[in-house]
Amino acid sequence: MLISVFAGAVGLAVHVVFLFSIFDIYFKSPIIHGLPAYEVPLPAPASRLVLIVADGLRADKVFELQKNGTTRAPYLRSIITEKGSWGISHTRVPTESRPGHVALIAGFYEDVSAVTKGWKDNPVEFDSVFNRSRYVWAWGAADMVHLFTKGDHGKRVFACTYDNDEVDFADEDASRLDTWVFAKFEAFLASASTNKTLKHMLQQDKLVFFLHLLGLDTNGHGYNPDSMEYYENIALVDRNIKRVVQLIDEYYQEDGKTAYIFTSDHGMTDWGNHGAGNPSETETPLIAWGAGIGQTRLSGKDGYYDGYSEAWNLSLYRRVDVKQADLAPLMAVLLGIPIPINSLGLLPVEYLNRDSHFRAVALLTNARQILAQFKQQEHNVQETTFSIFFRQFKADAKKIELTEMMETLLKQSRYKEAVQVIEKFIELALKGLTYYQKYDRLTLSIAVALGFVGWMTFVILLLLRNYTGIMCKSLESQSKKMTPEWQGKIKILSSSTLVIFLSIQNAPFMYYFYFLIPIVLWTMVLYELDVYYEAKAYLRRFEVKMWFLALAVLAVLGLELLVITFFYRGVMSLGLVFIGLWPFTTQLSKRMSVAWLAGCLALGVFPLLPVIGKQHNYTLCVAQAESVCLYHTLTLALSVWQRGSFSKANFFHVLLSLRIFPLIFYFSKTSNANIEHKEGLPLFNQILSWLLLVLSPVLCLFSTTSLFNRLLNLTLSLLVPFLLMCIFYESLFFLTLCLVMFLWICIEHQLSGSTLRLQDMTFEYQSSSTQAKNVTYHIKIDDVRKAYFFMFFMLVAFYGTGNIASLNSFSISSFYCFMTVFRPFTMAAILLIKVLIPLLIVSCAFRALLQSIRVSNTALFLLVFIMSDFTALHFFFLIKDSGSWLDIGMSISHYLLSMGMFIFTAVFHGLAWFLTTFSLDFSGHEFKRHLL
């Protein structure tokens, strides 16, 4: 028991620290404070800017022609062909609203730590175009508009928003959200005629009008981007943008000082989701016109070979693509305000209609603003590094050379050549900035890797000492064993030296943990060094080196297979084939071996199926419900036949669950039908769905703790909320997984040679004598296999119906039985429950397995921890912060999942223990609660 608690406490601390280490190593915040502001020292091209962001609008949907050859957005298309500039704005992962708006208006890509606040807030205040403007008026959703009112000490941002409750995915007409914005804007301009203060403010320069349009995002989620609702919403936006331009021209008497930018924060998948890095999510439209914006130009060689322009019939008009963050310096230059100090955007000079001199000066201002970040970051690194260890950016000489070239070209008025040199200079400065942001990466990575290896080595030695019979105390091991006194001296000396070294360098607080943890772990390993020599002597004494080497190679190959499954979902099917063939190498009966193989092959079909996206098949769902009812009816009959009796509580629970299943699919089908017909979510369905979600898992606690009965009731209890979220083949996967878990329990029990029948076993709390027996338990090679199977089935449960990259593939209709109003955290919680229910089934089956064969829980979980950390170490070095945004998101997800296996395993085992051993019982009028 003490071993389990100690290893668990140390392991939890290590994993929590290393879990967050990637945010210091790979994803540091790009925000630097105390920087100077730079603005173009020339007259501004525009006095005001209208920024229109159509949330969730895909580039192809607004640019492409319909089947009849007409466009969905005639006004916007006329701007492209007659008086403006256009292109694609490429966003970054995560393709969510907040990061997209921050990139647009502040010019930098948010650090991943913002995910802890649901991408709804940033841990650090930041500069933006709005901060630098004289006045900003914003209309739209509160979540987006109020992003930029935080820290508005100058009271320059005036927000007009609607409540989040208005965002309903089942709304009959979600485009009314956009109509509301346009109506408020029109009323705003009309009120200026009677409001002298407002009229005076509107006559100033450096003004921004921000229109956030959420209708397209809402319709896309509710009906998908190929729906008529989405297309009609595009047409509505197009008509109202034309009206906005007319209103502004009338108010300002066509003074030609208004610039317009129309874009989107992110796109959307075909099934109505966003968040990942598919092209449909990262490619958004950009159309700019008005003051300071270049006129329509016929296309020359623009360097784009993706075929988009031709497909959209726009190849005649020059296209200029940008990164989303590039729009912040563009807006700042148009208004003549300082570029946001943390902006990483490169000014797209081709969008400006000014001469080459203005372009060169504007781009030079952009270069100075980025160079200021570079110098400050370099200074920060120097402040925390000993001069003898400081490694300067290698391209500093190139930077000096480019600086001299810029100055020479500008003096000679060779502005076009100067623009090219300045762009190279900015590119170099950005590389230097990235270099210093990653300055400590190698050192920290080595420290974390040493910590991983130290932890795994310590756990292996712990297993060898306490759960094997190799400790015979040979003379060699006794002579090599470190005394506690020496262990303490080494730990204190090394830790003190490191702390002094880090404090002198003013290292961040978390760095102490990253460097101290490996020292502590390896000191513990040195203390257990006698185990290593005993193991070596054991291998030498019994001449099993080659056998051990072969097993080690097999184990590594098996773990590498786990790593590959994170990248290629179908590999799980191959693994299930091998696992299905395993019983044929044992003494198991042929009938059971064939049943196991059939179950594994059936389960292996699901990773080969497409991930569940926008597909709906409620007929299949009903058929699955009938199969579930039949399966559990047969199970109930079998239990009565084998035991000769069945408790009233169990019978009532099973009967109640079976009667609920048809109702579940009725609610699910009617809820989705009502939403599709724009009739909204029925209140009765919603209330009952929430009640079933909360109360159903509790029903299993009223059954007895008999192993089979409790598992049957637990399966039914968890299946009820799971079915409420099913839209395709998920329940069939759930049923197959339950069947395989049942077979696994039976097989392991038969192989254990236990004389006690499974039907007679209960989930009882282990007595002290049993625990004492488990302390002296010696692990076998078969136990390594059991731990591997558990980890493999956990991955199958997690990714059996979903996308291996992220949870992005889940359809929003999965929670239509519960809600349609936009509540991101509640929606995420519901989807998380859907994902975690199969994991809980595997954990409960593993709990039953451990109970039936009486092995040491601690030993098996230590084996699981070693395996999960082996995969985590892989993903730690496979994390990416460059390349495609999809790859970046996948690498983070893989690492977090593999690291979370340690915590998930412990949490799910504890939850499984509670659900299998805890009972609630009614006896007369007395309510009893007992823990067996």
Predicted segments, located by residue:
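A long, amphipathic alpha-helix that forms part
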Residues: S4, D24, A37, P41-A44, ...
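Active-site-proximal alpha/beta segments of enzymes that process anionic O-linked groups
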Residues: V5-L19, K28, A46-L51, R58-K206, ...
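Alpha-helical transmembrane segments of integral membrane proteins
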Residues: A9-D24, Y439-L932
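Structural motif
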Residues: L51-V53, V208-H212, I261, I287
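Divalent metal-coordination and catalytic microenvironments
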Residues: D55, L104, L211, I241, ...
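Phosphate/adenylate-binding glycine loop and adjacent helical scaffold
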Residues: V112, L347-K438, I446-L450
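C-terminal helix/juxtamembrane-tail motif
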Residues: V157, D168, W180, K184, ...
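Histidine-centered active-site microenvironments of extracellular/periplasmic hydrolases
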Residues: G256, F262-Y305, W312, L316
